Amino acid sequence: MAGARFGIVFLPESLADFGALCRDAEATGFDWLGVADSQSVFHELYVALTLAALQTSRIRLGPLVTNPQTRHLVVTASAIASLDELSGGRAALGLGSGDSAIYTLGAPPATLAGLEEAIDTLGSLTSGEAVKRAGRTWQVHRARRRVPIYLAAEGPRTLELAGRMADGVIVGLGLTPEVIALSLAAIERGARAAGRTLADLDVWWFAKTNLADTRAAAIDHIKMALAASANHAFRFTLEGKGVAAELHEPIRALQRAYDAHHHEIAGAGNAGLTDRFGLTEFLVDRFAIAGTPADCVAQIRRAMAAGARQFVITGFVPDPRAFMKRWTHEVAAVL
């Protein structure tokens, strides 16, 4: 995959064939295999990641993404340290404020201060260090290596936090040249505040993805994923995120209608929201790499010209194994 690197994230909908899916991800050249964390909607994150570790030998593995709200930090540190040992040092921890995992429980998203504390605490715990929190001493005695932490970020303040504290960033604000510039500037501000540079961070860009013989068919299968992006990336504020004023109310209407229990489920109610509120084309341009192979190549080249180089794409499609093979031969090989 010369010129660009790709990771892929899966929804653990079935465990029976998950190992084969992971083997194919590695065999087709992906550099990162992520698993979504949504305990009420999909199978358990770390069970799926254990399968992935046992069925692969090269590819990076980890949650894309977990959160500090539904799992105690010591539990997460123990889980990711165990995965790191099992996989021979291939684990990476994707961390965010929470989405369907928290909303299906009625829990609040992590605050910026909570994310900052989580990054600091998880880094220490996975290094095997003792940490004092809330009058207690926490430690993961079998942890041996500081597992790299990647912060999933959409807003300027979270992007700055990533630049200041994280090992890497998973940018979820979009893929247009304007949004890429805005995001990189925020990450760089945070990096400078910590005496670092943008080059010190491993930056990845999240893309809702599909390939088909026609652009319309590709988009149709990922409308639930586009709705999820609108619901998540703009949930706290639309300010400072490069969204035209006339789109604010349609986005808020979509968010009011969004059902966390149907998060990322094809054919469920959320899939109809992008058309219902007239947002499909905006969301495709903003968040997607989707269409024919030529469409996808053009979208990636546009993003690369703006400064993006590494992309986490979604395998939220009817046949992810066929999708990966086609992606490798008809998109990645062309770049």
Regions inferred by a protein language model and the residue ranges of each:
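Short, acidic/polar
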Residues: 14-25, 76-79, 153-161, 222, ...
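Hydrophobic faces of well-ordered beta-strands that scaffold small-molecule active sites
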Residues: 4-10, 33-35, 60-64, 91-95, ...
